[in-house]
């Protein structure tokens, strides 16, 4: 038997920012680490590719019901400040 996995792929300009450790697990129940991100409008497990080729997986929520924001997890507060806030054209892959 063969299975066909469908993946929705689209591009969206996202307002990107960064966050770091709070000591608490993410909304999906796992503890945050580099390579994870928060978004209200994308399902857990969706992959987002940034323009520099970095791929992050949605594992958290922002809590504001935003449809155009992405919050990237960084190891330190300094890395968050260095990243700042950017509007980036991102590739989004949503698994079936």
Positions of PLM-derived features:
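Solvent-exposed, well-ordered loop and adjacent helix/strand elements within mature globular domains
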Residues: 2-96
